């Protein structure tokens, strides 16, 4: 049994005791209380060894894939779970019955208010890919959620007043996405190791808000990212059970939707729902991360080279198969099957281009509705009416009753050949342009970045980096020039893009394009491959102090 104790726990930041968003009096000190820290430290000590073992297991799978002796497939040892038609997910939770339009975004105070005021059903508040994990972003995200749930989030800036449109009980249901199992929070050390970022984000939010959310007629609801194995879902389930027992609420109060955004997880969808069981609220199609994971896990196999990113769509064979299997799986088990992101943002100065972009969104949502999804994501409040218009055609709060008849095989999930797919110089430029712009903003503390009229998050930068690594590694030939993709070519174009973007930057010489390029270069030359850009760059945004805070004074 793990003892509840803050011995050998070091908090390497000052704890703000002054409110930052008046008239609210909430401070960081109200979040980092002694009892809240004891709770997250207990969870970390109980589950961290298992977390690390599961991360090591990912690399075991990668080595087997790289050797060519192993191919991804449905797990024989869990066939009994897949073949048992009797088990189901739980009864749908209050506030999670109709999820036809979900908005997403980081927990910045203004964005939180705008999202809660949007004409949507649910709001995925994101500590993960659309947030740069600076200490202030993470801890003030907790402050902002604490205030929103207590109807005290309104605040003024010199240019604008931000106010909720009513009682939060009647506004969109909040679903929090903590950081993935692979990330750590280096501002808080437990037993000489940084605490799991997943447990930090989940634990603080749950500890302070679970009972308040139940009073609102909702509950502590989560989105779980980046999982690659059903045992990683079991780990979350174990965390949930301990957390609910600790604060004295019934097991099954927590609900979690899992993003199927890694290739290995696509072969274990039923097992993931099964492991969460009473806590499951379905699965979601995380399209860009799924493409990133497909390239990452198959990067050394010349049979799985993807073309220019704009040619990899939701109707590409391997993507279409994954979507159809997800919907069939979820609905057979009685849980939601959520669609993917519409990343478009309004183009205010070009009505024709804006209409074209909105038509693309509408067509994408129609495809999702027709396939059988129960709802979908938008990145901007202006897109919510389009999603609403489409999904109102369900005529019901969801379409879980509709089980599409389709058989998706392991071979279908690995069918990465895209008809008429091409790799061109423009594809290299586009990957470098998007990757550099996103990384530069992330290093400055922004994880939700408008680029070329799309709201981009970390997944799109990951695709950029992986594609370039893969094209260099396999020496592909460019369709437009006949030139071979080499480390020298990608480095040359990288330097050109850095120069162009630096000159155009409104920050002048304070921009971080050179720093972004330093990390990008060995990856796009094919010299190294990091599991995640976010972990690669993380130390650049950590801001710890030498002397730990005295926890007895919290």
From Swiss-Prot:
Subcellular locations according to the entry: Peroxisome matrix
Gene Ontology molecular function: any one: malate synthase activity
Entry EC no(s): 2.3.3.9
Outcome of substituting residue 199 to V: In strain: Pasteur Red
One BP annotation, GO: glyoxylate cycle
Stretches assigned to coiled coil: none
Motif SKL peroxisome targeting motif, residue range(s) on this chain: 552-554
Pathway membership: Carbohydrate metabolism; glyoxylate cycle; (S)-malate from isocitrate: step 2/2
Regulation: induction: Expression is sensitive to carbon catabolite repression, but nearly insensitive to nitrogen catabolite repression.
Key words of the record: Glyoxylate bypass, Peroxisome, Transferase, Tricarboxylic acid cycle
Phenotype seen when the gene is deleted: Strongly decreases the growth rate on ethanol or acetate medium.
Primary localisation category: other
Stated consequence of mutating residue 541 to V: In strain: YJM269 and YJM270
Known role: Malate synthase which takes part in the glyoxylate cycle. MLS1 activity is essential for cells to grow on oleic acid as a sole carbon source. Two steps of the glyoxylate cycle take place in the cytosol, the splitting of isocitrate into succinate and glyoxylate, and the dehydrogenation of malate to oxaloacetate. However, the formation of malate from glyoxylate and acetyl-CoA undertaken MLS1, occurs in the peroxisomes when cells are grown on oleic acid.
Subunit structure: Interacts with PEX9.
Family: Belongs to the malate synthase family.
Protein name per UniProt: Malate synthase 1
